[in-house]
Amino acid sequence: MVKIAFNTPTAVQKEEARQDVEALLSRTVRTQILTGKELRVATQEKEGSSGRCMLTLLGLSFILAGLIVGGACIYKYFMPKSTIYRGEMCFFDSEDPANSLRGGEPNFLPVTEEADIREDDNIAIIDVPVPSFSDSDPAAIIHDFEKGMTAYLDLLLGNCYLMPLNTSIVMPPKNLVELFGKLASGRYLPQTYVVREDLVAVEEIRDVSNLGIFIYQLCNNRKSFRLRRRDLLLGFNKRAIDKCWKIRHFPNEFIVETKICQE
Ligand SMILES: *[C@@H]1O[C@H](CO)[C@@H](O)[C@H](O)[C@H]1NC(C)=O
């Protein structure tokens, strides 16, 4: 200000010009700063909205993942692990009169099974359909390794027959799964021999509710009988036993012919 007082007109003009330039410069700078700010604000808004979008997506995927895991848990809880296996094995029946003929082709009989094997429950539920070439009865068989029981439901008679599980005949579920795997892959020679069981229905069982849920479901509301091996029967009226039938199945790498007789 003091300087201005001594300024010549040219100096004043110069000063004005300088001020003009400064004003211009400062305006430009301000505009630049403003533009920068606006830009920054604009980019921030953009980042903000995409961030919100990401969060929403993340949240949604968490909810979805939760639903999937929850659903899987509920499914696993309510639907026990089980797989249905199908298999066929053939056997040579030396007692079949057709096979005792000399020079005749050996007559192999097929046995087909459908098995629901539940390793978690230690149980095998075997369905024997109506056989096409033999006199065996269709049946549903339960081998319950937890309860140590076998139940035969003869589907022609509608009766249940129960006996202790014979672990030297029946393979554990894990090995049965392997056997069916081998049968399915065709790597296994499905020709085998027969083991015969001769059983007698000795007494009626009125209450099957203490034999496990699986046997209960199979045999509840049906006539149920306890089976005994004929060779272990002492003092039993053997002549009174007249009706017999067979169930052929494979609880192992061989066929078991279960003959059940009843008065
Ligand atoms: C299991 O079955 C086999 C073959 O039939 C027999 O030799 C064995 O005595 C049976 N075991 C029991 C406990 O019945």
UniProtKB/Swiss-Prot annotation:
InterPro entries: BRICHOS_dom (IPR007084), ITM2 (IPR040145)
Entry annotated with the keyword Membrane: yes
Record keyword rRNA processing present: no
Keywords: Disulfide bond, Glycoprotein, Membrane, Signal-anchor, Transmembrane, Transmembrane helix
Location of the BRICHOS domain: 133-227
Tree of life domain: Eukaryota
Membership in a protein family: Belongs to the ITM2 family.
Protein name: Integral membrane protein 2A
Lineage, top ranks: Eukaryota, Metazoa, Chordata, Craniata, Vertebrata
Gene this chain is encoded by: ITM2A
